[in-house]
Amino acid sequence: MTDNAVLLGEGFTLMCLGMGFVLVFLLLLIFAIRGMSLAVNRLFPEPPAAPKPAPAAVAPADDFARLKPAIVAAIHHHRRLHP
């Protein structure tokens, strides 16, 4: 009976050591990736963003007045072709 308890204790010890090593490795990996990212950004900085062009002028509110004759002509043409 005591042999099983010792074996179970060694199993838990081995499990904790394994999880500890994996945790340490993953933390080191995270810091290494962050360090490489900082190094790359220092050596090869991104170029400054080009200024955005000014927005195009907004069409006047009475734009419908210019389009009204074209719309009427299109409706007339459609009705003439499809009575």
From Swiss-Prot:
This enzyme catalyses:
oxaloacetate + 2 Na(+)(in) + H(+) = pyruvate + 2 Na(+)(out) + CO2
* One Gene Ontology cellular component annotation held by this UniProt entry: plasma membrane
Q: Which GO terms describe its biological process?
A: sodium ion export across plasma membrane
Among its keywords, does the record have Transcription? no
Q: Does the keyword Transport apply?
A: yes
Annotated Pfam families: OAD_gamma (PF04277)
Lipid bilayer topology: Single-pass membrane protein
Species lineage: Bacteria, Pseudomonadati, Pseudomonadota, Gammaproteobacteria, Enterobacterales
- Write down the EC number: 7.2.4.2
The coenzyme or cofactor needed here is: Na(+)
Name the keywords, alphabetized: Cell membrane, Ion transport, Membrane, Sodium, Sodium transport, Translocase, Transmembrane, Transmembrane helix, Transport
Source organism of the structure: Klebsiella pneumoniae
Q: Which family does it belong to?
A: Belongs to the OadG family.
InterPro entries, from UniProt?
Na_pump_deCOase (IPR005899), OadG (IPR023424)
Instruction: Say what the protein does.
Output: Catalyzes the decarboxylation of oxaloacetate coupled to Na(+) translocation.
Q: How does it assemble?
A: Heterotrimer of an alpha, a beta and a gamma subunit.
Compartments where located: Cell membrane
Which sequence ranges are marked TM in the entry? 11-33
Q: Which GO terms describe its molecular function?
A: decarboxylation-driven active transmembrane transporter activity; oxaloacetate decarboxylase activity; sodium ion transmembrane transporter activity
In its UniProt entry, what is this protein called?
Oxaloacetate decarboxylase gamma chain
Family annotation (NCBIfam families): oadG_fam (TIGR01195), PRK02919.1 (NF002792)
